[in-house]
From Swiss-Prot:
Zn(2+) binds at C333, H384, H510. Homodimer. It is an enzyme of class 6 (ligase). GO terms for biological process: threonyl-tRNA aminoacylation. InterPro entries: aa-tRNA-synt_IIb, aa-tRNA-synth_II, aa-tRNA-synth_II/BPL/LPL, Anticodon-bd, Anticodon-bd_dom_sf, Beta-grasp_dom_sf, TGS, TGS-like. This is Threonine--tRNA ligase. Catalyzes the attachment of threonine to tRNA(Thr) in a two-step reaction: L-threonine is first activated by ATP to form Thr-AMP and then transferred to the acceptor end of tRNA(Thr). Also edits incorrectly charged L-seryl-tRNA(Thr). The lineage of its organism: Bacteria, Bacillati, Cyanobacteriota, Cyanophyceae, Synechococcales. It is found in: Cytoplasm. PANTHER family: THREONINE--TRNA LIGASE, CHLOROPLASTIC_MITOCHONDRIAL 2 (PTHR11451:SF44), THREONINE-TRNA LIGASE (PTHR11451). Residues 242-533 are annotated as: Catalytic. It comes from Prochlorococcus marinus (strain MIT 9515). Its EC number is 6.1.1.3. CDD domains: TGS_ThrRS, ThrRS_core. Gene3D superfamilies: 3.10.20.30, 3.30.54.20, Anticodon-binding domain, Bira Bifunctional Protein, Domain 2, Threonyl-trna Synthetase, Chain A, domain 2.
Amino acid sequence: MPKITLPDGTKKVFEKAVTTLDIAKSIGAGLAKATIAGKVNNVLFDATLPIKNDSKVVIITSRDKEGIEIIRHSFAHLIGHAVKQIYPNIKMAIGPVIEDGFYYDIFSEYRFTPEDLIKIEERINQLIRKDYDVEVLQVSKQEAIKTFKERDEIFKLRIIEEIDEKDSINLYKHEEYIDMCRGPHVPNTRHLRHFKLLKLSGSYWRGDSKNESLQRIYGTAWSKEKDLTNYLKRIEEAEKRDHRKLGKKHSLFHIQEESPGMIFWHPNGWIIYQILEKYIREILRKNEYLEIKTPQAVDKSLWEKSGHWEKFRDDMFTTASENRTYAIKPMNCPCHIQVFNQGLKSYKDLPLRLAEFGSCHRNEPSGALHGLMRVRNFTQDDAHIFCTEEQIQEEVSTFIDLVFEVYNTFGFDEIIIKLSTRPEKRVGSEDIWDKSEEALTEALNNKNLKWELQPGEGAFYGPKIEFSLKDCLNRIWQCGTIQVDFSMPVRLDATFVDINNEKKSPVMLHRAILGSFERFIGILIEQYEAKFPIWLAPTQIILLSITERNIKKCIEFNNLLNTKGYRSKIDIRNEKIGYKIRESTLARIPLIGIVGDKEQELNSVTLRALDGSNLGIYELDNLFKLMNTLIEKKGRVD
């Protein structure tokens, strides 16, 4: 007689083993109809599996986050059901849930096309309209092997081989189709309505290029039609803003096969990069950072001593010369400690803030590379603060102000903050962990900031705070971080002389604001849709001549603007002015200055903004003042 305790404290006693669906029916028909699964003693559980013991039960519906994930996982199995009906000889690999959707990896000699995707989607629609029950079978390992041997599902058999003999395996029956999964899944396909298959891509079994090549079908699914519609609109908008497309269209950068994951910056893109670097350099100078430059290639002995060789060897690019092995640096921290170690340091020298625009290389898998967002060569706005335990809170507090100043400058006003605390495996005393976590917590609380705790998610060498941006499409980008490190200064013999004339190891704070220039520029391209604010725009103003009579004046104005330090261009082609305006607008130039007979006579320009609004006639001195005002505002939105 299991006693079931519901979230509101209500207790229900049943004569025999009971399912989540039975519990829902005992409450009401409407709830039973909406039930997708249960959470039994905090573990997700299929709605039709029996609960035999006293348990705390939460009924999961499509309104719950877990409910949406279960819907998506069930749709992945529907891909298998549909594809096996259309192409019986294909082999199913894995079909997990991912953010906002799901995918299924499939082995097939036949190459799927976009037309096949439409056909598969139509078949899924036919299947879900049948409202059939999804049956869950709990079987032994041997029974599972027998089931998938009969179906010649070689990838399922490989997965089963890794499962312990004692563990039971969940099989899910969609009519004639059988799949396996930890579950849970929906009890009936009536819960599966709002979905879309999105795209095809290639993959490898277990993500290893030495294994079989697979085809991946991506999809998304939601509990409501309006949520699906909104998501598809967001995808469409994201594709429009894709930094790879805009980078090519506006000649900002490119990547080519001969140098995967490494950026060829074009003049327009390099201007943005240099402006960003100049801005961060000014911020660092105002905050008393000392800029340094350290080598690209460093003998492996330093990486062995720092611990990176053991942990990150496979992610490093290496080279050899004169019987020595060098690693191209994947991060800057060990080199910054070498600079700190030059000369005796006193407590009076702390905090010491060393900054570098450090070019790093990491051998990321080729399949993970993605435009500017995931590269193999990147530049960090990296700095390391050497300080005492007592100085941690003040340094963290100052850095938080710095992060908000920079992000607000670019128009980002929603910043998500997460504090990660001590993991199970860690170095350092409990006392220093206590002090560090308290310092980070106090720094956040003293600023009345909203933040999220991530217990156990800190690095083995110290706690950290992560800062993420929310962009115009509500996507989250983790950029900034400040991380306490008790370990590396000790490993690399960094010391200072304290007030008692004793040698001590400093605490090192790893910190970055942008994360990497490449990724941050990628975020900016998509955030602004390449309509950069005037301070960042590769071309700030373009002057258009109306007739040949105005060409000389156009050139004169352009020379004056460039002499003053503005980034100005001219279009003096023998084309209609409307055509020139359209071309300049498509090029995303913030200001368009028109020079005709009237403007020539008044020694002025008629100014248009990128959005098409007419700003009026400006004499050059007033134009300079306007541009200065706009440039000073940077990316802020008034």
